[in-house]
Amino acid sequence: PFASLIDGDFEEKKEYFRHYCAFFYKMGYDTVSFEQCIGACMPGAGALGNHVDPVIKNRADFEAYPWEEIPTLYFERFSEDFRALQEVMPAGMKTIGGPGNGIFECVQELTGYTGLCYLMADDPALYADLFRKVGQTNQMIWKQFLDRFADLYCVMRFGDDLGYKSNTLLSAQDIRQHIIPAYCGIVQLVHEAGKPFLLHSCGAIFDVMEDLIDTVGIDAKHSNEDQIAPFPQWVERYGDRIGNFGGIDTDAVCHLTKPEMREYIADVIAKCSGHGGFAFGSGNSIPDYVPAQGYLNMIETVRELRGEKI
């Protein structure tokens, strides 16, 4: 076990990343996925991730909140992690990631989803100001991050779950008005640094995909769940304009046998071929309840189908 090494001194962090990068290399990846989340550095946060009492419930809370401290807290906490990774990155590999958490998630860390919905009705001005302020703060973090660590990365990304099984969590109009402008500022910085931007967003977000592609300028999108739309549907609809990351529903990784998984994956690849570039993997992050053998079956199947000898 090496997980605790990341909490050690700089040399221990480097040893952690040697093991961490070796895993991706041995699994056949060209990239290492690594991010550190902004929400972890927001004072009083946790209303989304840990269901704590929201730190912002009204205008007075908003005005008293230490917004200006967040960028400093972020880099004080995480700069050594990124530097350690930078020093041990294997030759020929790059990283995908950056400052984790998108605008919607960071707002919810302070208000909770229910609290945010109440503010939408009770104080529309505060509701708008929350997105504006989080957008400004996160953009400051991204600017500093790209100045320091852009060379470590081949693709920049954050995750911001805008939807659920059948719709977006906010109206499409609210996403366009309050979230899309903040995305634009960050993605512009990413593009100015010469990097492509990948958005991870769960849910049925079809109503805002045109905005994400045409207005924000995302270069790729990740997340798929068969109950919403099988991966080939995303590739067929958007593959001529953006890259698509994903492929196999994470639930299928849990339950399919290796022969069943091979049939599933071969079918997905066949349907996606000819519709632009895609990167095959799980439709969402691999949680701890996924059987290790299921994950290994996925990796081995894809590597075999692309012609590797395992």
Q: Residues of each region from the PLM?
A:
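Active-site loop segments of alpha/beta catalytic cores
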Residues: F2-K14, R18-H19, D30-S33, P54, ...
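Glycine-rich, N-terminal phosphate-binding loop and its surrounding beta-alpha-beta segment
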Residues: Y16-G46
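Glycine-rich loop at the start of a catalytic domain that most often binds anionic cofactors/ligands
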Residues: F2-D7, M42-N50
